[in-house]
Amino acid sequence: MKLKSFALTSLTFCFAAICGTPSVQAATLTTIVNGISNARAVSFGPDSSLYVAEPGIGGNGNCQPSPSTLFQPICAGNSGSLVKVASDGTTQRLFNNFESIAEQPSGNQGAGIQDVQFDSQGNAYLLTGFAGYPGNRDLESLNLGANFPIPEQQLVTFPPSTPDKVLNTPLLAQLFKADLNTGKLESIFDFGKYEITNNPDGGDVVTNPFDLTVSGDTAYVIDGGGNTAYKIKLDGSESEAIAIPKKVLSASTLPPLPPGQELPPGLVEVLPGGNIAIQSVPTGGTIGPDGALYVAEYSGFPYPENESRIFRIGDDGNPEVFLDGFTQITDLTFDEQGNLLVLQFGDESQLQGDLRFLPGSLIKVAPDLTRTTLVAAGEGLESSAGIDIGPDGKIYITKRGVGPELGSVVRVDNVVTERVPEPTSILGLLALASVGATGAIAKRKRQNKLSEELLAKAEIV
C-alpha cells in the first residue's frame, strides 16, 4: 500500500538520543507569506519572485478512498493555485481555481499543484499530484485501467470508481510546461497513465507526484504514491522510472490495535520471521555535487521514527541507501557549500499527534557527513513540506503543510548550532567529501538577490 500522509527522534545524528544535538541558539524564522492551503513546494523564478504550490482544499465533487488518508475519502473541487510573491512584496494567485482533491469537510491532505520549477532559459514547469488510484481520475483513465490488473488488497481498500463517480480531474498527476502569464499548460508526462500501464514498483496501482527538480534538459520527479523516481526529458522524448525499495522492520514496530480490530489488507507486507516491509513513500529529490539524484523518503504506515532513508541514484539507475536514521523527510536540497539540507515534516510519528502541527526540524549534513540540527523540533517548523535556497543564499521553508489557510513560507535566520560527527559511511564520504564545496549543485537554479522591498515586508515570528 503506497501511503503518503499529506497527501504525507533519533537514530539520526550519531543516534541523537545518546549524543544529543541541541541548538545553542534558536533560529529566527521570518514569515514571507502565509494563508496557504495545504502548502507544498517553495521555489524562486528568474525574476526573483517566490512561488508556493497550493494544492487547495478539494470541494464537493466526487470522492475516492485514498491510501494517503488511510482510505478515508478525498473529494474533488477547484480550489488550488500557485501563489506568487513578487520582488516588491505583491502577492497574487496564478492558475486560480485549479483542480484539487482533499478530505472533506476538513480540507486537509490536499493534492493538486505540487511544485513549480524553472529551466536555465526561464521556462516554467508545473507538477500536479493525485493521491489515489489513477483510474479514478477521469473516464479516459478509468477505461484504460480496465485493461490492466489491480492487486486484490487494493480492490478491498481503494477500488476503481464507477463511471459516474470518477473525479473529473484530468489535469492531476501530470508534468506540464507552463506559461505563467497566459495560464497555458502543455503536457509533458502523464504519471496516471504510466502508473496504470507500467506500475514500476509492482505494488498497488496508485500515484501521487510530489516533488520536481529541473536540471539541464531533464525533469526529476519523485512520486510518493508510486514509490518511484522519474527522469524525464523536458521535451517528453525519453523517460525512466526507478522504483524505490521498501524497508524491512520488526513487526514490533506496529502499533497495538483495539480488541477485535485488524489492519486493512495490504497496509503493510508481513514477512517470515516476525518482520514487516513498509512502503518507502519518497517525497523529495535533488541533484548532488556529484551529479547523482538524491531521494528522501517519508516512509509509510506505521510511520516509524528514525527509519527514513536518503537514497543516491547514480548513472546505473540503482537506488543505494546514502544515509539513514531520519524521521518523515519531506524535502532536501544542497546549498552552495555542498551541505545537504534535510527537512523533516515531524520528528515524531504522525500517529502521535495532530498532523497539522507536528514538530518538524531542519538538519544540515556537511560534506564530511557531520550532521547538525539547524532548527530543532519545537522551534517553529511545524509539519514542514518544502525547502529551497533563495537568491539571497538563505533557506526558505514551507511550514504547516496540512490544512486550509494554515501554511506559510518562512526564511531561516541567525542559525547557531552544535555539530555532532556522523557514524562512518564510506558511501557518503566517497559521494560528497571528495567533491568539495565548489562543485555543489543546488536543487534549484539560484537567481539574483531578493529585493529589499520583499524582505522589508517580512514579519518576524
Describe each model-derived feature in a short phrase:
Residues 35-47, 78-79, 100-123, 171-172, ...:
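Beta-rich, blade/repeat-based domains predominating
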Residues 55-57, 129-131, 224-225, 298-300, ...:
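Short loop/turn segments immediately following the C-termini of beta-strands
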Residues 383-418:
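Blade-level signature of beta-propeller repeat domains, shared across WD40, Kelch, NHL, RCC1
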